[in-house]
């Protein structure tokens, strides 16, 4: 224990004397027990503050949990703010190559013990003057049995906060990937004169979803539009096609396209397809990814009018799911998403009321006591909204369930 404390004391001293402008290489150690697409889409974009803070230093990130490797790779591929993404065990990492290590992991205590066992001489004699900081509690939920060993790098965190929201979140899809999505859709019957609407139907919490009857009434309305086909993601190939046919009947179901068992990055290619003209869904990971893809397209010259209509519906958030109180508002999740039309369902005069986030003042954006869960949305209010945005006349729903 004394040896470990001596190593830690030397690292802490290095932290106190760090000069960010002299740092050449930075390593982020990232490990989480659960994976949420939307959380990580936003989180990895925040890494764009690291390079300018460290004056252009090389930035590598190592994902310790290999179980999520394919999904991590989908989110960081082509990201210009990250030089290398690896999936190595600690014994495979050349730690001495780095001047700064940033921990976003619950394993900080295990890390200091590992470094003491493998690098104590280099650390104590000053051969390796590494500074190690913790960002764990900035990005992850605190756990009762989680010991934070390393200090927060407050200057870096302050810089990240000061630059947050200056630019929208981005994902980086290449022209070749976009064309892959176009061809995949053509191979499944989408014609050049047809539009693709994408309906997102899954999320981490059931309360974030519409009632099933409301969802299918909306989908039925969309399928009645001319020259439109609708894409449904069936990531785990759980048999969604049969379920949709049961609800819609064979005739309307023929206008559906199901993507089954595709990789996450391939899903991105479909979201970014040139055929995609509308994306509708709950506050969920793929909606954040869609927003991020088109933010990047527009920054690189796409006319804003060429981006699809994107609509997310939100309501009351589960407090226990969130790291900070601010996370229980739609504004936290969508306030920096200029392309997304964010809807909120709330109670007004004891009746459900649907409002747009962009029309709320600061007090209304931060209010949570009047929010309702998403099962309070009606098909009528959503279809009327969709028809106004799509410039199509709403249909009369003979069997709609309000």
Show which residues each predicted segment covers.
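Donor-binding and catalytic core of enzymes assembling or modifying cell-surface/extracellular glycoconjugates
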Residues: 88-95, 210-320
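A nucleotide-sugar donor-handling region in carbohydrate enzymes
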Residues: 1-11, 133-196, 398-401
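Structural recognition of alpha->loop->beta junctions
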Residues: 72-89, 248-259, 334-342
């Amino acid at each position: 224990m004394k040896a470990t404390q001596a190593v830690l004391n030397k690292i802490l001293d290095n932290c106190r004397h760090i000069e960010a402008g002299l740092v050449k290489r930075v390593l982020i150690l990232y490990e989480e027990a659960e994976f949420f697409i939307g959380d990580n889409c936003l989180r990895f974009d925040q890494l764009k503050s690291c390079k300018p803070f460290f004056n252009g230093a090389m930035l590598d990130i190592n994902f310790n949990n290999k179980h999520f490797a394919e999904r991590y790779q989908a989110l960081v591929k082509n990201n210009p703010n990250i030089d290398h993404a690896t999936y190595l065990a600690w014994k495979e990492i050349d730690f001495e190559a780095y001047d700064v290590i940033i921990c976003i992991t619950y394993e900080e205590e295990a890390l200091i013990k590992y470094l003491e066992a493998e690098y104590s001489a280099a650390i104590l004699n000053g051969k390796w003057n590494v500074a190690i900081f913790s960002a764990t509690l900035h990005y992850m939920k605190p756990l009762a049995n989680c010991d934070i060993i390393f200090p927060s790098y407050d200057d870096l965190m302050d810089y990240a906060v000061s630059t947050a929201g200056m630019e929208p979140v981005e994902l980086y899809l290449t022209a070749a990937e976009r064309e892959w999505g176009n061809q995949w859709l053509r191979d499944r019957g989408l014609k050049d004169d047809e539009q693709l609407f994408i309906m997102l139907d899954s999320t981490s919490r059931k309360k974030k979803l519409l009632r099933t009857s409301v969802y299918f009434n909306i989908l039925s309305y969309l399928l009645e539009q001319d020259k439109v086909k609708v894409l449904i993601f069936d990531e785990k190939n759980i048999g969604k096609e049969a379920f949709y046919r049961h609800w819609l009947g064979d005739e309307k179901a023929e206008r559906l396209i199901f993507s089954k068992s595709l990789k996450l990055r391939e899903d991105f290619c479909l979201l970014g397809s040139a055929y995609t003209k509308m994306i509708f869904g709950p506050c969920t990971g793929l909606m954040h990814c869609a927003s991020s893809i088109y933010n990047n397209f527009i920054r690189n010259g796409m006319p804003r009018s060429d981006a699809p209509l994107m609509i997310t519906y939100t309501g009351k958030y589960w407090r226990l799911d969130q790291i900070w109180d601010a996370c229980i508002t739609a504004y936290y999740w969508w306030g920096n998403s200029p392309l997304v039309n964010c809807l909120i369902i709330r109670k007004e005069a004891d009746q459900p009321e649907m409002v747009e986030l962009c029309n709320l003042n600061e007090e209304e954006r931060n209010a949570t006591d009047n929010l309702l869960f998403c099962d309070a949305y009606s098909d009528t209010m959503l279809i009327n909204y969709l028809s106004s945005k799509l410039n199509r006349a709403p249909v009369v729903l003979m069997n709609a369930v309000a």
